[in-house]
From Swiss-Prot:
Gene: DUS3
UniProt feature, compositional bias: Polar residues: 63-72, 233-244, 257-266
Originating species: Kluyveromyces lactis (strain ATCC 8585 / CBS 2359 / DSM 70799 / NBRC 1267 / NRRL Y-1140 / WM37)
Active site per database record: 390 (proton donor)
Function in brief: Catalyzes the synthesis of dihydrouridine, a modified base found in the D-loop of most tRNAs. Specifically modifies U47 in cytoplasmic tRNAs. Catalyzes the synthesis of dihydrouridine in some mRNAs, thereby affecting their translation.
Protein's recorded name: tRNA-dihydrouridine(47) synthase [NAD(P)(+)]
């Protein structure tokens, strides 16, 4: 037993009294303290079974779009000895579509016609399609189509996996549950927003979209940069210019027409830059009137790639969250009109107001154009957030995410460009304490953010990029930065050119997984709120505890109801056809990769369980609780069958962590 750890006293009968080795397991550093009757032991000397594997929380910020980068090469012996550890870097969870797919024209109309006629590669005969369609889904939780039940009609029509609940199978007549007016009311209360118009997206794809504001602000920023370069190199520039002019005089007749034209263009450009510099150098040229952003004591869910999808955010709204964010969208694919990227700003109507879109970029032009495209094409956005904290290697090497911490001048240019083009949508930023362990730089960066930008909010994650999740977040430093921000704001107020700025919201982030942490961090009056990430994945009811200011020992049935809500929201979003159900099941398993980590309060000797504490293998108070806590991805699939029916042969799911991949014999 570690002598630095206090021994936990607990009542136990003589026959239940654990041996010394059991006590070691329960009180070891980094291990959750469980009641001995819930710890699973597999030998006579009292040692517990080893844990299934360590959690790697890089999943919080990694998605299939970003994880296909080559893994580090590991030498043979080491690789073989750790074959069940680490991440499945090249996993591909894309789902297979139907082989005999129904033509979209016939999805809700058996008598429709298709302009491609016999040349169409899809099925036109509805009865033929139904004869080859996979068996219908019928579960205890969803005996009828949940979408049809909530909206009054099912957009999936004959493709729906619950078809018999809203179709006369003899006449193939589709049934509506409510009249048109009633269905409109239901739609108003349950629909998705931020759909980009098809023509506008096509303009982006064909590069016909006019980035008028971006072009202008980028020209101003370039002029400022050029002037600064000239000022720094005045003497050197003068000598160079003199030498160049001498050369030109000596070789006047040899200068080509093309070179002259190029020189004229450069001269015109430099004159234009000089004009812009003189016009704007003493102004906050990027300032725009914005909607007020209020994050004070709001319950905020962090942007979460892959798992932070629309159904999850909708679930968190139902469970008490005030502010949610999209998954991180990459700026360049947004500018190019990529479908997968434009799916990310979509939100449920319950999320707005209080919904932010997060983008990642490496260049100023990317930030400005992505922000302008968003502001012009989506209306349900409360803020646009610049991700300057993502630790993923692929993005870091490209200059995105936390790489901007190493280049604060570029970060500031990105934010100012975004602020100018985003109309009345506030711009915010999320940063880390730094990139290298032991070298925090957030204090110096936040000073520049306060004085040189108009950001409406700053979120600080209390770790460096290098630390990732190996150490606890440094909340002392986060509090120090929060205090400094108010000092910098006071300094800004003294400057007549800067004092028009609104109060900057400051949000702390990192390791908050219970209501006591929440209120402890907010004892610092300079902290506006706390952003919750993994804590809200493992325990989605965390904001209910914040409101009640007490811990809630959710039963297995209550937790299963939470999963039911998630599945219902997933089918509303991805659909109830075969492909949609596969997508729902896949993201259900992604959600379970965090949700299973909850250790029930009733089996713990010490509570709360910290995020970096891992339990020994345990059994729950009932079989369902044990199943919900399983680390085996096969058990997650069993849980999914309660909601989505039997897993078909075409379904594909590879867990993020290899330690979750084992099969139970």
């Amino acid at each position: 037993m570690d002598p630095s750890q206090p021994q936990v006293k607990r009542p136990a009968s003589s026959d239940e009294q654990p041996s010394a080795k059991k006590t070691d397991t329960a009180t070891s550093k980094g291990i959750a303290h469980l009641k001995p009757e819930f710890i699973l032991f597999n030998d006579q000397n009292g040692s517990s079974r080893p844990m299934a594997g360590e959690y790697n929380d890089e999943e919080e910020s990694t998605s299939s779009r970003l994880e296909s980068q080559p893994a580090n090469q590991i030498k043979g012996k080491k690789q073989n000895s750790k074959k069940k550890r680490g991440q499945n870097k090249n996993r591909d969870n894309r789902q297979v579509r139907e082989q005999h797919a129904l033509c979209s024209k016939f999805v809700t109309n058996v008598d429709a016609t298709c302009s491609f006629d016999t040349k169409c590669r899809y099925v036109h005969d509805v009865r033929e399609y139904l004869s080859k369609k996979a068996p219908e889904i019928k579960t205890e939780f969803f005996p009828i189509c949940p979408v049809w039940q909530s909206l009054g009609h099912c957009p999936m029509g004959y493709k729906c996996c619950f078809l018999s609940s809203h179709c006369n199978m003899e006449t193939l007549e589709l049934k509506d549950l409510y009249e048109v007016d009633e269905r409109k009311k239901l739609y108003e209360a349950n629909h998705e927003i931020n759909h980009i118009d098809g023509e506008r997206k096509y303009d982006l794809i064909k590069r016909r979209f006019s980035f008028t504001k971006s072009d202008y602000i980028l020209e101003i920023i370039d002029a400022m940069q050029q002037e600064n370069r000239d000022l720094m190199n005045t003497s050197k520039g003068s000598e160079t210019t003199t030498d160049a002019n001498a050369g030109e005089d000596a070789n006047d007749e040899k200068v080509s027409f093309q070179a002259t034209e190029k020189q004229n263009q450069l001269t015109e450009k430099r004159e234009r830059q000089r004009e812009l510099y003189l016009k704007y150098h003493d102004t906050r040229f990027f300032a725009q009137e914005k909607r007020k952003l209020d994050l004070h004591h709001k319950k905020i869910v962090s942007p979460l790639t892959t798992v932070g999808n629309l159904p999850y955010r909708r679930l968190m709204r139902k469970l008490g969250a005030d502010v949610t964010y999209s998954e991180m969208a990459l700026a360049v694919p947004l500018i190019q009109g990529t479908n997968s990227e434009w799916a990310l700003p979509k939100a449920h109507c319950s999320e707005f107001p209080g919904f932010g879109v997060q983008i990642a970029c490496s260049k100023t032009w990317q930030a400005a154009k992505a922000a302008e495209a968003l502001a012009a094409n989506v209306t349900g956005v409360s803020e646009i957030n610049l991700n300057s904290g993502c630790p993923i290697d692929l993005l870091y090497r490209q200059g995105s995410g936390s790489a901007l911490l190493d280049n604060p001048a570029r970060m500031i240019r990105c934010l100012n460009g975004m602020n100018y083009v985003s109309n009345d949508i506030p711009v915010t930023v999320k940063i880390r304490t730094g990139t290298r362990e032991g070298h925090p730089i957030a204090l110096s960066i936040t000073k520049r953010l306060v004085l040189e930008t108009d950001v409406a909010a700053i979120t600080l994650h209390g770790r460096t990029r290098q630390q990732r999740y190996t150490k606890s977040a440094d909340w002392d430093y986060v509090g120090e930065v929060a205090n400094a921000v108010r000092t910098y704001e006071a300094e800004r107020q003294e400057n007549k050119n800067l004092r028009d700025g609104q109060k900057i919201q400051f949000v702390g982030n990192g390791d908050c997984n219970n209501w006591e942490d929440w209120y402890k961090h907010l004892e610092n009056k300079n902290m506006d709120s706390v952003m919750v990430a993994r804590g809200a994945l493992i325990k989605p009811w965390i904001f209910e505890e914040v409101d009640a200011q007490q811990y809630m020992d959710k039963s297995s049935k209550e937790r299963l109801e939470i999963l039911k809500d998630y599945c219902k929201f997933a089918m509303d979003h991805w659909g109830t056809d075969q492909y949609g159900i596969s997508q729902c099941r896949r993201f259900f398993c992604e959600f379970m990769s965090f949700f299973h980590r909850y250790v029930p309060m009733g089996i713990c000797e010490r509570y709360p369980v910290l995020l970096n504490e891992r339990p020994p293998n345990w059994k729950g108070r009932d079989d369902l609780e044990t199943l919900l806590g399983s680390t085996d991805s096969n058990d997650w699939l069993k849980l999914s069958e309660m909601f989505f029916g039997k897993v078909n042969d075409e379904f594909v799911f590879t867990p993020k962590h290899k330690s979750n991949s084992f099969a139970t014999n």
